[in-house]
């Protein structure tokens, strides 16, 4: 059976029948099978064992072409068809991207062949809720339990049926009402129960959103982020009041600010004119490449050759900085050094750049809190510090829902290549979680050491509606404290930083809440604990205990995939999947 491939790294089945044939062949040959969507998850979570010798980062190069294992891409299974007009029921191939994916491994993704575009323009329909980006494929977004920011709406509410190929090559169907256990098991299953090939969605009529984003100090914020004020609404009140929301938190010394984004639904009206949201409104067109190079410099002070090589390889767009930054003085004490570093990065050899970094890195490190505060004041100034007609006012926006809800869609994977670990908590603990984080940060009085705790970039804070999916991070049986939904936060880490955040950064957060016996879960597609040390093993054991249906999931997994063709060493170790037989 001919199956097209990309550079021999991926198999690209033309149809569901080809997926079935590939799985049956893998079953006979004892090969692993995994599926890549948009490669937005950690690479070890996506691919077969062939990538385990490569770094575990997002947006990684594909598996080695020498691999005999099967890494599938379902870009050709991307149909979208309305099959029940009255009930807004749609069938969609699992390989269809939610929106345009600029980093699509097949380079076939367009806005016009995306799920949201086709729903909107062909059927005047949409889905209830979306994440911060829509680069993902439908199957990938479901498989990792990803979500946007809402306690009222959930993408899971749109899913009514799932077609998947199990480990023996049988095409199975799970219906939300008729096969509740199977449906809720496969809904968030990380590819461990089979290959999701088609999804049935109950969509809703197209709608718009309107909203605002403020940049404020803790004191200026309209709600009390830490839940300690008797006069202001709480963070939980904010979550409950808005239809959709997110807060970007900058907890670093000298910065301490919040960037709450909020939106409400609006009905479609004739003559509606979108006013799209813009990130980094001070410099919306320039911010990303400049932030990228600044953070790459700050994250590689002890290994400058690594940064130089990335620039020379074209991985970091130094030309964008040269073309767009004309006033280096706005960066304060870092301005002149930044200008010289940019110039040295363009030279044919690394000697001068390395020498300059080595000569100045002690000064940069000592002044890092001041440098960072000045950088953030340039790109994320307080509304009260703005000039002109925007002074003191939040950014106001309105848009069609599929393009307004994913507020980070314009963020470039090239410029802002970010890694995450995302911690989910019962939403009723919102104030407790934020207070614990703040107190942990503030207990370190040395500004430089405090930056080691906060990191150099922002922390995203979202909420999510409860889910019945067995391995959803927001799973609830409606009798537990998760029933009202979840609050979640993710400290952001640049891929271009030299250190490994799974060793250097994220364990402090995992341990803080584990040691206080605060229930939390980790996003399956993002960074999980390393298991080469006892501490990581203990953390993962703690995480597994937060899933009441995990044992049921693993038992069902064994029945659906007895030869364990979907099980990689990564998932075996993290979920404690018993060996075959």
Where do the protein language model's features map onto the residues?
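Noncatalytic alpha-helical scaffold of FAD-dependent oxidoreductases
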Residues: 1-581
């Amino acid at each position: 059976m001919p199956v097209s491939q990309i550079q021999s790294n991926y198999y690209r089945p033309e149809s569901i029948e080809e997926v079935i044939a590939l799985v049956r062949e893998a079953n006979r040959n004892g090969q692993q099978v995994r599926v890549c969507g948009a490669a937005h998850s950690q690479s070890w979570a996506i691919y077969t064992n062939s990538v385990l010798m490569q770094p575990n980062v997002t947006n990684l190069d594909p598996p080695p072409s020498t691999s005999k294992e099967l890494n599938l891409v379902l870009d050709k299974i991307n149909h979208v068809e309305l099959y029940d007009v009255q009930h807004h029921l749609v069938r969609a191939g699992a390989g269809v991207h939610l929106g345009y994916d600029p980093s699509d491994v097949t380079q076939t993704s367009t806005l016009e062949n995306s799920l949201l575009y086709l729903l909107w323009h062909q059927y005047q329909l949409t889905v209830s809720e979306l994440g911060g980006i829509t680069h993902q494929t439908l199957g990938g977004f479901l498989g990792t339990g990803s979500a946007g920011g809402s306690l009222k709406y959930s993408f899971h509410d749109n899913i009514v049926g799932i077609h998947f190929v199990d480990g023996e090559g049988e095409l199975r169907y799970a219906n939300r009402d008729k096969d509740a256990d199977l449906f809720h098991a496969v809904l968030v299953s990380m590819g461990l129960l089979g290959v999701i090939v088609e999804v049935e969605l109950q969509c809703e009529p197209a709608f718009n959103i309107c909203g605002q984003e403020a940049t404020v100090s803790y004191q200026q914020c309209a709600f009390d982020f830490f839940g300690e004020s008797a006069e202001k609404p709480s963070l939980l009140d904010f979550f409950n009041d808005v239809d959709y929301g997110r807060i970007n938190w900058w907890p670093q010394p000298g910065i301490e600010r919040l960037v709450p984004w909020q939106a409400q639904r609006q009905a479609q009206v004739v003559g509606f004119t979108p006013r799209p949201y813009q990130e980094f409104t001070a410099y919306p067109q320039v911010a990303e490449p400049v932030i990228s190079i600044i953070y790459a410099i700050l994250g590689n002070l002890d290994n400058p050759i690594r940064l130089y090589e990335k620039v020379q390889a074209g991985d970091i767009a130094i030309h964008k900085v040269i073309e767009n930054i004309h006033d280096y003085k706005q960066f304060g004490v870092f301005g002149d050094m930044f200008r010289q570093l940019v110039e040295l990065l363009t030279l044919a050899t690394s000697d001068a750049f390395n020498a300059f970094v080595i000569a100045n890195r002690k000064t940069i490190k000592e002044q890092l809190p001041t440098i960072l505060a000045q950088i953030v004041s340039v790109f994320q100034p307080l509304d009260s510090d703005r000039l002109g007609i925007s002074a003191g006012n939040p950014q106001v926006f309105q848009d069609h829902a599929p393009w307004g809800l994913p507020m980070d869609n314009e963020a470039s994977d090239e410029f802002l290549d970010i890694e995450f670990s995302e911690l989910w908590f019962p939403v009723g603990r919102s104030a407790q979680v934020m207070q614990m984080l703040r107190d942990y940060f503030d207990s370190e009085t040395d500004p430089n050491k405090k930056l080691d705790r906060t990191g150099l970039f922002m922390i995203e804070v979202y909420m999510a509606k409860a889910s019945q999916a067995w391995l959803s991070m927001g799973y609830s049986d409606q009798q537990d404290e998760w029933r009202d939904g979840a609050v979640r936060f993710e400290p952001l880490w640049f891929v271009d930083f030299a250190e490994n955040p799974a060793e250097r950064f994220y364990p402090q957060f995992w341990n803080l809440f584990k040691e206080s016996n605060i229930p939390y879960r980790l996003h399956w597609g993002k960074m999980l604990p390393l298991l080469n040390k006892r501490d990581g093993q203990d953390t993962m054991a703690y995480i597994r205990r937060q899933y009441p249906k995990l044992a049921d999931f693993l038992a069902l997994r064994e029945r659906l995939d007895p030869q364990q063709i979907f099980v990689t060493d990564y998932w075996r170790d993290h979920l404690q999947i018993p060996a075959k037989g």
